[in-house]
UniProtKB/Swiss-Prot annotation:
Chain spans, region Interaction with DNA: 53-56
Family: Belongs to the archaeal histone HMF family.
Protein name: DNA-binding protein HMt-2
Primary location recorded for the protein, binned into one broad class: cytoplasm
Hydrolase in keyword set: no
Keywords assigned by UniProt, alphabetized: Chromosome, Cytoplasm, DNA-binding
Biological role: Binds and compact DNA (95 to 150 base pairs) to form nucleosome-like structures that contain positive DNA supercoils.
Oligomeric form and interacting partners: Homodimer or heterodimer with HmtA1 or HmtA2. Dimers then assemble into higher oligomers, with the DNA wrapped around the protein core.
Gene symbol of the encoding locus: hmtB
Organism taxonomic ancestry: Archaea, Methanobacteriati, Methanobacteriota, Methanomada group, Methanobacteria
Amino acid sequence: MELPIAPIGRIIKNAGAEIVSDDAREALAKVLEAKGEEIAENAVKLAKHAGRKTVKASDIELAVKRM
């Protein structure tokens, strides 16, 4: 896992949880990493299609919209 667990716990608490288990933090981190990689892969394809090596915020935003 590459995402730090503490911010994941804060995300869950910001959603209304009072207490968050380590298992819950790790589970959400795995899901977010998988979705993040999927979005990044699609953004890279969009940048390449546009003839660029640089992935821009607009590539990320479009990749998310296409999901």
